[in-house]
Amino acid sequence: MYLLIPAAGVGKRMGCDRNKLLLEVRSQPIIAWTLLAAQAASEISWIGIISQPTDWPDFKSILANLQLTKPVEFILGGSTRQESVYNGLQALPKAAEQVLIHDGARCLATPNLLNSCAQAIRHCSGLIAAVPVKDTIKVADEDGIIQSTPDRRNLWAAQTPQGFNVELLKQCHAEGVRQGWEVTDDAALFEKCGIEVQIVEGEETNLKVTTPQDLAIAEFILNSRDNS
């Protein structure tokens, strides 16, 4: 299975002016934990890191220390996540029929989750990892006035990996460019094109490291795994 890792962002909410994936959790850069999970996932055979060239020397140094046995390629990132994934799709080997896309900042995803998504995407056109929403969700207007309360039994918190048929995802990205759609994940492009996206049960610990508080939580989770 082919894995694309969007890793081109700057950690503004983290309060830093460089790629947040270079920040460390337990003496390892965030991206290193993501790559180690991909290395340990038996279904993953190829990894593409979508990032800016200014980060490539740092990423190459990290890779040298990890000594992964799977091929890793660097792909030029875009100005948005959507553009970055589009670039990643164009750079996939011709043999790629399905692809997993996994945020580099979700460094706590386990090899089991990557394997589950890789196996499931062989039997559907699109999928996302997701977990049921536990909190009550309110929909509010621009003035902060509550408009409705959706039934949380129908609500899922989207995660990554997200998996897709490569040709279908390319077509959806092309349609997104034509229509001027701006989306925050690839599943939304499938939805806009009327293509079903299946849910694979995600992991409660699969958080996206976005804030300094998330770094502390990630460290706690990694420590607890060592002690279990």
UniProtKB/Swiss-Prot annotation:
The record marks 152, 208 as: Positions MEP for the nucleophilic attack. Keywords: Isoprene biosynthesis, Nucleotidyltransferase, Transferase. PROSITE patterns: ISPD. It comes from the Bacteria. Its EC number is 2.7.7.60. The record marks 13, 20 as: Transition state stabilizer. The keyword Transferase applies. The keyword Cell wall biogenesis/degradation does not apply. Pfam families: IspD. One of its GO terms (biological process) is isopentenyl diphosphate biosynthetic process, methylerythritol 4-phosphate pathway. It catalyses: 2-C-methyl-D-erythritol 4-phosphate + CTP + H(+) = 4-CDP-2-C-methyl-D-erythritol + diphosphate. NCBIfam families: ispD (TIGR00453). This is 2-C-methyl-D-erythritol 4-phosphate cytidylyltransferase. The gene is ispD.
